[in-house]
Amino acid sequence: MANRQRVLGIVLAGGQGRRLLPLTADRAKPAVPFGGIYRLIDFVLSNLANAGFLKIVVLTQYKNHSLDRHITTTWRMSTLLGNYVTPVPAQQRVGPRWFSGSADAIFQSLNLVYDEQPDYILVFGADHIYRMDPRQMLEEHIASGASVTVAAVRVPRKDAHAFGVIQPAASGPERGRRVARFLEKPADTEGLGLPDAPDEVFASMGNYCFTTAALLDAVIRDAADERSAHDMGGNIIPMFVERGDAAVYDFHTNQVPGSTPRDHAYWRDVGTLDAYYDAHQDLVSVHPIFNLYNQDWPIYTHHRPLPPAKIVHDGTSVVDSLLSDGVIVADARVSRSVLSPSVYVDRGAVIEGCVLLDNVHIGRGAVVRNAIIDKNVVVPDGAAIGVDPQRDAERFTVSEGGIVVIAKNAVVEP
């Protein structure tokens, strides 16, 4: 049923990602590399494309050059069939101003909706790690009769303070399906537990399915409200909740081809350095919590013409790690790490629990532990990173969890 409807995908990709600094100092948050060869935005675009939703606009704003370049070089659809993935920056169609919120981004881009005339609009975020078949959400939305359906992931009630929390109806024919309340990062979680799991709550995933007319009406009215922050989660969704016109979609029910009980319903918000690091650690075990190797629901990205990874010399050890194309590990030890394209690890180096982005060079005898190193950084021979917390804090960014982060193109002293 879902594929017979006219559906437009709108991906909100204008986020700055301040909590991911310095990784976002030179790029938009959705353009941050992940998992060796991907960008964060590849996950939402792959979910939409795998589901057959091939008319997608990506609303961009903050430091969008690398993001726009990635989309235009990677996500080229067949124009013969009218399909497209198009990055759309703020165009100042309603005056000399940029996007002032996610709802305002849609309001300023309504010409794209009018041109396509869809029956339904999928408004999805651009910076989460997950697999999802959005057709199933659309089908539930149509069956519910609601104007909007909000996708929700189950999280422990004790963690509710970190999320926008959806409280579903606790009784009546809409029990567990209609949204009774929407609370942003509630301090008091008493009574917010789910009807079938009192110790869990629904956290908003930032993914919404709208009936088109309802979304148009909402963003137009919101644009006229000078008191509004013009935010989808903070202003638009509460409009529908207040009048009982919002449904909730339980992400746990989503069935993705090729998924296993271990990675079923995996979803990660990688909005902090520690969360970004932890999500990489989810990739590297023998049976990973998130499996990049599921070819029944592939994650698409741009593949550069690089040679295969190479491991040389008898003394080399690589354990529980991902090696991308162009990587060379020469008589060194690598464990629990993700190495992006063209990383070079020289003789005698030790890499433990690290995320190394493109073109990082690790010198001879260097020791690097629990670190994220951005592109084009040269770690000199004999350097020690992640070994002396005090010296690390003097030279680099250190996350709350103790992860050392080195900015793109940084010069590392011996």
UniProtKB/Swiss-Prot annotation:
Gene Ontology terms for molecular function: ATP binding; glucose-1-phosphate adenylyltransferase activity
Reactions accelerated catalytically: alpha-D-glucose 1-phosphate + ATP + H(+) = ADP-alpha-D-glucose + diphosphate
Gene Ontology BP annotations: glycogen biosynthetic process
InterPro entries cross-referenced by the UniProt entry: ADP-Glc_PPase (IPR011831), ADP_Glu_pyroP_CS (IPR005836), GlgC_bac (IPR023049), GlmU/GlgC-like_hexapep (IPR056818), NTP_transferase_dom (IPR005835), Nucleotide-diphossugar_trans (IPR029044), Trimer_LpxA-like_sf (IPR011004)
Pathway(s) of this molecule: Glycan biosynthesis; glycogen biosynthesis
Chain positions recorded as alpha-D-glucose 1-phosphate binding sites: 164, 184-185, 204
PROSITE patterns for the chain: ADP_GLC_PYROPHOSPH_2
Protein origin, superkingdom: Bacteria
Keywords: ATP-binding, Carbohydrate metabolism, Glycogen biosynthesis, Glycogen metabolism, Nucleotide-binding, Nucleotidyltransferase, Transferase
Cysteine-cysteine disulfides: none
EC number(s) recorded for this UniProt protein: 2.7.7.27
SUPFAM superfamilies registered for this protein in UniProt: Nucleotide-diphospho-sugar transferases, Trimeric LpxA-like enzymes
Family indicated by similarity: Belongs to the bacterial/plant glucose-1-phosphate adenylyltransferase family.
Quaternary structure annotation from Swiss-Prot or TrEMBL: Homotetramer.
Role noted for this protein: Involved in the biosynthesis of ADP-glucose, a building block required for the elongation reactions to produce glycogen. Catalyzes the reaction between ATP and alpha-D-glucose 1-phosphate (G1P) to produce pyrophosphate and ADP-Glc.
Name of the protein described by the UniProt record: Glucose-1-phosphate adenylyltransferase
Gene encoding the protein: glgC
